[in-house]
Design a protein with these regions (language model features):
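Helix-to-loop junctions at the C-terminal end of transmembrane segments
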Residues: 87-100, 289-303, 391-392
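Cytoplasmic membrane-interface "Motif A"-like loop-to-helix N-cap segments
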Residues: 97-109, 300-312
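C-terminal transmembrane helical hairpin of 12-TM major facilitator-type secondary transporters
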Residues: 305-352
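Juxtamembrane intracellular "pre-TM" segments in multi-pass secondary transporters
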Residues: 22-37, 216-244
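C-terminal ends and interior cores of transmembrane alpha-helices
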Residues: 106, 110-125, 313-329
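Helix-loop boundary and gating motifs at the non-cytosolic
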Residues: 30-82, 241-246, 250, 254-264
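Transmembrane alpha-helices of Major Facilitator/SLC transporters
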Residues: 84-88, 278-299, 310, 317
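Symmetry-related core transmembrane helices of the 12-TM Major Facilitator Superfamily/SLC fold
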Residues: 113, 195-212, 400-416
Length: 434
């Protein structure tokens, strides 16, 4: 732009400063001190790292395996190898007790890089035990890395920074899905698959050591040794029952509708190009914008209002697809439903992640957060597995309406869950790092 319409250096600096301030205001971080804003960069890096292996598992491998002649049933069955994401709580104490969490991230990501680099050396068409073991290693390392990243982030981010941090966190994760997932599939059109996996492995290796750019966070020795007491005191009372039920049910509607969105587009007669452009690419962009906006909302109005208001918006958005199915609203109606669902999905995700972070004790976050994330991820895998049966039996419109109803029980639990929320953000202060 400067080449066509030259700007004075002073005006250029003012323009850049205004854009930067707009971004901070959008996040609700305009009053945060500079050290707090630097933490947001660390959070963005870590969650880009966290989302990268998932992009290979969800976006790249299904395409690769299908091109190798693997059946749809077998590809679907491979989702069972993702169970480590739901079981990671059982080995999270190891991450909590031993070593620097940054080095856990480095080690896991380096192992993931090796696993991805080995993929083209195995005959995927046979779907033999060697490939299954390699994929299980990949998912286990990815799940373990999640434990380290989530724990580190809870310790890094102060209460006043949680809204903005979770907006950045959800957005960076989605950007990784686009860059490493969609980008890899795009490159597969011009590169051989073995080169593509080697390139991805190289990127993963670089990302592994980039984690050391994050500041070192020390856990007190007493917190490391007494992790079990910290967990049982936190969860071992009757007031924990509403918390667990809330985590189980808050994203039920999202988990139920997700697997059926793309098949619905197909059955509406939309082209592959439209599906790739609108609900996939544009949808992820909108979810990133929604996550950032959700972080700004939470920074201003607090986590309780966030999970209530933003969660309800996310639930209501499922009805958009129901109306399209019931009343045959055509292409524009379908596009509108997609825009609403994608943006509000980002809003609800930012609120939920902020809630999970807030209810954990910072000194015992490794096990506590791993427990909560295991609970809701298990719910997602179970409800997703039967979503096709539900849509087939009652029809798309009724099923999408049912996903809205499934979202509602969580909100009835909010009066009991509210007591778990720590001091609401006041947009001041920051955690100490060394």
């Amino acid at each position: 732009v400067n080449d066509l319409f030259p700007l004075s250096p002073r005006f250029d600096l003012v323009l850049r400063g205004d854009m930067k301030m707009f971004f901070w205001r959008f996040l609700g971080a305009e009053r945060l001190p500079e050290p707090s804003r630097r933490k947001l960069g660390v959070v963005a890096l870590l969650y880009f790292i966290q989302g990268s292996p998932v992009a290979i598992l969800w976006e790249v491998l299904p395409v690769y395996l299908r091109l190798q002649g693997v059946s749809l049933a077998a590809i679907g069955g491979l989702r069972l190898l993702e169970l480590p994401y739901s079981l990671k709580v059982f080995w999270s104490p190891l991450v909590h007790r031993y070593g620097d969490r940054r080095w856990w991230i480095v080690g896991c990501m380096a192992g993931i890089a090796i696993a991805v680099g080995l993929l083209p050396l195995i005959d995927a068409a046979q779907l033999g035990w060697l490939l299954l073991v390699l994929l299980l290693v990949l998912t286990t390392l990815s799940a373990t890395q999640d434990v380290a990243i989530d724990s580190y982030t809870v310790g890094l981010v102060a209460r006043a920074e949680e809204g903005a941090a979770n907006g950045v966190r959800a957005s960076a994760y989605r950007v990784a899905l686009v860059a490493m997932g969609g980008g890899s599939v795009f490159l597969a059109a011009v590169l051989p698959w073995n080169w593509l996996f080697v390139l991805a492995a190289t990127v993963f290796g670089a990302l592994a050591f980039s984690a050391l750019a994050a500041p070192r966070l020390e856990l007190p020795g007493q917190a490391r040794e007494h992790w079990l007491a910290g967990f049982t005191q936190w969860i071992g009372s009757w007031r924990a029952v509403p918390l667990v039920l809330f985590v189980l049910t808050y994203k039920l509607g999202e988990f139920a509708i997700g697997p059926m969105v793309k098949p619905f587009w197909v059955d509406q007669g939309r082209s592959v190009f439209e599906i790739g452009l609108v609900p996939t690419t544009f949808g992820i962009v909108l979810s990133v914008a929604g996550a950032l906006a959700g972080g700004g909302f939470i920074s201003r109005y607090g986590i309780f209002r966030g999970v209530l208001v933003l969660g309800l918006l996310q639930a209501v958005s499922n009805l958009g697809y129901a109306f399209v199915a019931w009343f045959d609203l055509g292409r524009l109606g379908l596009y509108g439903a997609s825009v609403f669902e994608s943006f509000s999905g980002g809003l609800g995700t930012a609120a939920f992640l902020a809630f999970l972070m807030n209810v954990c004790d910072k000194e015992h976050a490794t096990v506590q957060y791993a427990f909560l994330s295991s609970v809701f991820s298990l719910t997602g895998r179970l409800i997703g597995a039967i979503s096709g049966i539900g849509a087939q039996r009652v029809g798309y419109g009724n099923y999408f309406a049912l996903t809205f109803v499934l979202s509602l029980p969580a909100f009835a639990l909010l009066p009991w869950v509210k007591s778990w929320i720590h001091d609401e953000p006041k947009r001041t202060g920051h955690a100490s790092v060394s």
